[in-house]
Every structure is written in C-alpha cells, then in structure tokens.
Regions:
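Compositionally biased terminal segments of proteins
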Residues: 1-229
C-alpha cells in the first residue's frame, strides 16, 4: 500500500500536464525493488524531466515553491516545491543523457506512470555514493540504496546508464565503480552521514530565478511545513 500522503499529492499533480515527468527517487527505488512503498519513510517525491519547460506553470495553484532553478544542469534541481496539504516536498530534476528514454511505464495506485529504469537508479546511487572516494561525507541512504539496487542487476547492463551519470573523475566503467564502492562503503562508515537541513529563513539562493507564473514562497511557510527550509 502506498503512503496516503503520496496518493493525495499525486492526485493533485494529476490535475496538471505532467506527461513528460518520470518518477525517480525513493518511491521509484521501492517500486523497482518490488517493496511496498509504505515501508520507506516518505519525505519527498522526486521526478526528472528533460527541460524546465516540462514543468507546467499551473502548479502554482496547488504547490508553493522553495527553489526555482530554470538554468540548472543535468542532475540538479529545477524545482523544489511543497504540497501545503500533505507537507510533502515535490522535487523536479533535470535528467541526465537518455535517462528519460530508458524509463518504462508502471501501473500505480494513482494511475499509469513512467518510472526511471533500475539501471539508472543504480548508476545515480553510485555517482552520489562515490563522493566517499575523495573523503566527502555522503548521506548514508545513497550507499544503502546502491547496495540494495546493485544486487538486482547485471553490472554489464548498467554501463550505458553509467556513461550518462558518472562524473569526469569517476571510473570509466561501471564495473570499476561497483568494485570500488564495495570496498569503500564498509571501509568508511565515518563518511556515511544523516544530513541536517537548513532552518535559515534569511538565506538567499543565488540559483533561484522566479518566473512570471512561478514565485518563491515565504521561507517561514516552508519551515512551518517541513521543519526546515
């Protein structure tokens, strides 16, 4: 059974033209793993799109916006919004390479929806977890998700997706990245952290660029809903 909050937010999103959106993030991970999504703590719903123009301006009638980044590159946040009725964050990211084309439809409680491919979820988790290779702390969920997901795939089938997701300094092949992470994750538990989110309502985001139809919410309103902003 899916979280009731998620169902309510998806029902709201269904009022808008989100045909170009692909579900990713924690919900997609649980769906691809064949696990009931309600078993995972739900803090946000993540999507990917190819361009900012894929985000309908009509969302302004149902959501409030914390970050609006029309010019962010692949992998980065285009929109961070909040459903004020469910206090769920709804994030939209710019997709890497051919990620959108590799997505496939799934029948979900809120209707038929495209979900990111398992191979892309593995490649994305590997990209994020590999920060520990250079001594940078990483949210522990990325390492945990990587280990759960990679156990279900043939590493050879991830190579194409890996070329889209890897950073320039990362191993050239997924096989190498996979081996490296299986060494690093158990060796560096000190770098696997639980992140703390900002509560600074005075902070100014240099990447935000509100549009005529989409305006930034009062940070205090976001803080009241999420307990961070």
């Amino acid at each position: 059974m899916m979280h009731n909050r998620a169902l309510r937010s998806f029902s709201k999103l269904a009022r808008h033209d989100i045909r170009d959106w692909v579900l990713t993030g924690g919900l997609a991970i649980e769906l691809r793993l064949g696990v009931e999504p309600a078993s995972r703590p739900l803090n946000d719903i993540d999507f990917i799109v190819n361009a900012f123009d894929c985000i309908p301006r009509t969302l302004a009638g149902d959501l409030i916006f914390r970050h609006i980044h029309p010019f962010d590159p692949p992998g980065k946040t285009l929109l961070q919004s909040v459903d004020p009725d469910t206090a769920l964050r709804i994030d939209v990211f710019r997709a890497y390479g051919a990620t959108i084309r590799r997505a496939s439809p799934m029948e979900l409680p809120f209707g038929r929806f495209r979900v990111i491919a398992l191979e892309d979820l593995v490649a994305r988790a590997a990209r994020l977890a590999l920060d520990i290779a250079v001594g940078v702390p990483v949210p522990s969920k990325h390492a945990r998700d990587f280990l759960r997901l990679v156990a279900l795939v043939d590493p050879n089938q991830v190579e194409t997706a890996w070329r889209d997701h890897r950073k320039p300094a990362h191993p050239a092949t997924f096989d190498e990245a996979n081996s490296l992470l299986h060494e690093l994750i158990p060796a560096r538990p000190d770098l696997l952290i639980t992140p703390e989110y900002s509560k600074d309502t005075e902070a100014v985001c240099p990447r935000c660029a509100p549009t005529q139809a989409m305006h930034l919410a009062d940070p205090n309103a976001v803080l009241g809903l999420l307990e961070y902003c």
